[in-house]
């Protein structure tokens, strides 16, 4: 087994920075209650008050927590931190998409993308790692290698920094704050299920009615196919709470081994067996993502095989014409080739959506997130 395959299948070491003080934004509501009971005993409702200030109001200073007792605020300020990510740059696409480059406390850069919805609101694509632990050959992030996992607070803070930016823009324009983040997808830098514990906690915070209060049906976690983690996702009932997307990208093990080395460990059959066993909300479907690569996986025979592979999953297929990036060994198929592939998939009885590239002029489209100065 080659070195790239080893990188693709081994869960990375946690690799989280060790803060001088704990960041309370990284605790879910139950954990915050336990922390306060241990360090500042008192009525349990105080933890909910603090949690709301941290995640609903996005407080940057403990002194702003006006309904929390002064003595409690003083203790929290001395024993914990409210550190936040820093927004380095914001790039704007001609289609309204924006790419945020954010800086961590230890100097690393990550990227997050804001995409206008067809209706109202925005979808935010967030990262779970600095770099990525996998080696998918069509993805620019893979060229960075794995640097470290993001802590829970760094995951949720991507949403909060974007929300604060949008609110400030509205205030500067003396307009109503209406450009709200309504959807979140874990499709940025990193493999979310290789950072399972931190992502799981972030989901709890983002969906908490006292926190960010984003409906679980509006959140999707994407994975390249870590079978044990998918099985855990199912056992813990996450499929009932949030959406699951599987990055499939091939219909044979030979091709998937080539474009996604993780397949050398868990073959397509094993992956789909795990997916079929994930209990999901009856109003949702598992999404299968298929990056269309010219001359690699875009043959009509691939479309026919997809019908056989996915027909009994009840899932939907997202076809994503490849988004080029420097050094990539692939090309985007011609539009007629894409259309023929989609039509063949529909003849197989599949529900198919073709994802229109968003933000590709600022390298913000699917598979394009990468950094020249990642450290």
What do the predicted segments below correspond to?
Residues 114-116, 198:
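Residue-level structural signal for beta-strand termini and adjacent loop
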Residues 116-164, 168:
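Canonical Radical SAM [4Fe-4S] cluster-binding loop centered on the CxxxCxxC motif
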Residues 50, 141, 186:
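A short beta-strand submotif of the Rossmann-like class I SAM-dependent methyltransferase core
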Residues 1-110, 167-174, 276-285, 290-375:
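Auxiliary Fe-S-binding modules of radical SAM enzymes
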Residues 100, 112, 124-126, 244-246:
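Short beta-strand motif preference
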Residues 164-353:
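Conserved AdoMet/S-adenosylmethionine-binding subsite of the radical SAM
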Residues 93, 127-128, 222, 247:
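Short linear Ser/Thr-Pro motifs
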């Amino acid at each position: 087994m080659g070195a790239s395959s080893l990188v693709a299948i081994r869960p990375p070491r946690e690799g989280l920075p060790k803060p001088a003080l704990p960041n309370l934004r990284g605790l879910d509501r139950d954990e915050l209650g336990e922390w306060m009971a241990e360090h500042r005993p008192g009525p349990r409702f105080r933890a909910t008050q603090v949690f709301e200030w941290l995640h609903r109001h996005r407080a940057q200073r403990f002194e702003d927590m006006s309904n929390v007792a002064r003595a409690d605020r003083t203790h929290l300020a001395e024993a914990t931190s409210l550190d936040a990510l820093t927004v380095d740059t914001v790039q704007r696409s001609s289609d309204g998409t924006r790419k945020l480059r954010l800086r961590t406390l230890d100097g690393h850069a990550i990227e997050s993308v804001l995409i206008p919805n067809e209706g109202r609101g925005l979808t935010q694509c967030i990262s779970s790692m600095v770099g990525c632990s996998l080696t998918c050959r069509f993805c620019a992030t893979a060229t960075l290698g794995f640097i470290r996992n993001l802590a829970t607070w760094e995951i949720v803070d991507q949403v909060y920094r974007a929300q604060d930016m949008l609110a400030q823009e509205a205030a500067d324009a003396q307009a109503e704050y209406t450009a709200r983040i309504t959807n979140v997808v874990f499709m940025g830098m990193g493999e979310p299920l290789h950072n399972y514990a931190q992502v799981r906690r972030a989901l709890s915070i983002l969906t908490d009615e006292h926190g960010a209060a984003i409906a679980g049906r509006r959140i999707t976690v994407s994975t390249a196919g870590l079978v044990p983690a998918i099985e855990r996702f199912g056992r813990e009932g996450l499929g009932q709470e949030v959406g699951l997307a599987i990055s499939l990208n091939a219909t044979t093990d030979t091709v998937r081994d080539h474009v996604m080395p993780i397949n050398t460990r868990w073959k397509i059959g094993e992956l789909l067996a795990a997916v079929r066993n994930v209990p999901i909300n009856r109003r949702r479907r598992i999404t299968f993502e298929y990056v269309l690569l010219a001359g690699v996986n875009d043959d009509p025979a691939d479309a026919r095989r997809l019908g056989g592979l996915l027909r009994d999953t009840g899932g939907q297929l997202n076809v994503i014409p490849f988004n080029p990036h420097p050094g990539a060994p692939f090309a985007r198929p011609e539009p007629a080739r894409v259309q023929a592939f989609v039509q063949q998939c529909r003849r197989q009885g599949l529900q198919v959506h073709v994802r229109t590239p968003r933000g590709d002029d600022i390298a913000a489209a699917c598979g394009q997130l990468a950094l020249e100065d990642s450290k």
